[in-house]
């Protein structure tokens, strides 16, 4: 019997962008604990860098697929690809957030409607979409982990819309857990 805590477990890691990503550090820990991992990249702009990073650190055979968390079709297609590798998922990491640069600084009062919609969609609603898509595959003791920050509870200068989005993410987490 293996002494690795996650031996035989499958983790889906959403949000690795580079070697400084919190998602990358979590994926390394899960991998070292024995988990089999499946990753995403977000769009062609990040594809080559993410593929190189994942394959150099986790092996050439580790699956990495395109995923646009703002598209239900993309989310569903991603999990169809995941199903080609496994019929169960034990842990899902949601490490995704976005707010347009202009919505992070200055007065929060100047936040535009489009920036608000985009930020909440990508930073918070994506957890709901990913959870719904993975739910049929989740093991009985499965876990979904989402990344937040102090700015969800306290005002942090130059965090503005991201703080509101993280507060929404935390609320989504509570309702999903209920």
Question: Predicted regions span which residues?
Answer:
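Short-chain dehydrogenase/reductase
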Residues: 2-118
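Catalytic loop of short-chain dehydrogenase/reductase
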Residues: 15-24, 97-136, 140-178
